[in-house]
Amino acid sequence: PIPSSPLLRLQNLQQHYRLEQNFFAQLFSNADTTIRAVDGIDLELYPGETLGLVGESGCGKSTLSRTVLHLLRPTGGKVEFLQQDLTRLSRPQLQQQRRQMQMIFQDPHACLNPRMTVGDSIADPLLIHRLCPPAQAKAKVEEMLERVGLTPTHEFYHRYPGELSGGQQQRVAIARALITRPKLVICDEPVSMLDASIQAQVLDLMQSLKQEFDLTYLFITHDLWVARYFCDRIAVMNAGHIVELGETEKVFNHPQHPYTQALLNAAPLLKG
């Protein structure tokens, strides 16, 4: 049963951009130059669930994830996390809450510093948030390396990201996200750059870590196969709006919105 109190609640969340125009374009054009990447989204995410956010590239999924984390400040609406409105927090208060909200990005190579060893990269969030003395960080990092399947841990600790495969890099990124013991993990296309066989291994790892660490996932993907395999509920996003929301099997077997139907028709093997 779903608990009554959501871990994350979005209320009329907006992320709008204005395109810069030159003087003459402004003078002779009455067109609205606002891009509504996230346009009035209401969404609730409950403890222990995996909510999939699906849609085509460019529909606003990644912008939504960055707005939830306040990597981008919302232009309107509210983000409530643990019943606290993040839009009202000061920068230090927000930094404190970020320990509880972590992100796994699409490209692990881009988010890992090539000059830092694997061990130092994973330890970095521990030290930033002052969760343990530097002398204790190495033991915590090696424990996390073991949890994500990078063994022997002492060897991987001293390697650099460029010495690892894509799947191993993503395991490091997962370890880095989980080292602060967050409650919410936002996964932005975390397996889309991996080979199919490695995808399945990383998804299985993420599922077991979810149970072990009592995690809640917001799982962003354009891959409907992955969403159906991994998610409890599905939110379908199109042009900055959530157009359909429901339990995974219900959305796949009985889609209500024309956009959802079109998405599924483009991947016919998924239906039924």
Mark where each language-model region is.
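Conserved ABC transporter NBD signature motif
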Residues: 77-85
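Conserved catalytic motifs of ABC-family nucleotide-binding domains
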Residues: 181
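Conserved ABC ATPase signature
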Residues: 159-164, 168
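ABC ATPase NBD coupling module
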Residues: 28-30, 86-102, 120, 128, ...
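ABC ATPase "signature
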Residues: 245-246
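Helix-to-loop junction immediately C-terminal to a conserved catalytic motif
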Residues: 69
